[in-house]
Amino acid sequence: MAEPALGFIGIGKMGLPMTVRLLAAGYRVTAFNRTPARLQAVRDAGAEVADSPAAVAARADIVFLCLTDTQAVEDVAFGEVGVGAGGSAGKLLVDCSSISPEATRRMADRLAATAGMRWMDAPVSGGVEGARRGTLIFMCGGESDEVERVRPVLGCLGQRATHIGPVGSGQAAKLCNQAIVSCNLAAIAEVINLARRAGLGEARLPQALAGGFADSLPLQIYGPRMAVPAVGEPLGEVATMMKDVANVLELARSLGASMPMTAAAEDLYRRTADLGYRHGDLETLMRLYDR
């Protein structure tokens, strides 16, 4: 069977390394980004470049999205020159963005009705480094045949793809993930501040806790960055976490689920944004403890 032609829309912090990995694996990829300058890196890696999401959908069998929020996904899918305008029956949209489960179900129904395309949500966890190394995990929502159709492609990008359930289930699982991560990062910032005030040598704390019950990938990645500011390139924005936590709490309210820890974390991210770090890296949570 011939390899599917792929499309990738959203060449950002995650989309760029994901697209490069697909090209390195030998897939033909057509790319689009709202800011054309971001396309040069994937063009240099061998991607074809399209002038609209519709053009991507016309050339590709499977179209990947990796966008900032629900509105961006809706615009790309259903704009005048959106995916729906170029898609047709038999094509598949795979959304790796982190967005609302309810909106995902609504958009999946709309795309099927207007273009005949099927929709699979496949948000990721693992961050920029996981995208570069091909160690992402995918939380998949959709029909089982869709998941199996795209599984070989996901294997080039990540270590595991789990079929959670029908459309929207992957997004709900990602929100569970983000609830844990948001609380974890908030706790790490508190503890780095505590270690600093206790004179423990906070930069060594992540190494000291490695392998114990308190250890985590966020601790090992962000602990050193919180202890020694401005180490390495930005990995994730406060604004993005605020968006995800807002979606977590919206889902919780709709289900009558109490999430007091996540609500407390939301307040900490909001306060960090109010200090001027809305578009700062997540390590800027430490600025809450400067005074």
Task: For each feature predicted by the language model, list its residue ranges.
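NAD(P)+-binding Rossmann beta1-loop-alpha1 motif at the extreme N-terminus of oxidoreductases
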Residues: M1-L65, K91, C96-S97, V128, ...
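Methionine-biased hydrophobic packing positions in alpha-helices, especially
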Residues: M14, M18, C66, C96, ...
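Hydrophobic residues within alpha-helices
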Residues: M18-T19, M107, V153, L194
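Residues in the short beta-alpha loop(s) of Rossmann-like NAD(P)-binding domains
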Residues: T35, D69, E143
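Rossmann-fold NAD(P) dinucleotide-binding segment
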Residues: P53-R118
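Rossmann-fold dinucleotide-binding core
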Residues: S98-Q178
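Helical "substrate-binding/catalytic lid" subdomain
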Residues: S169-R291
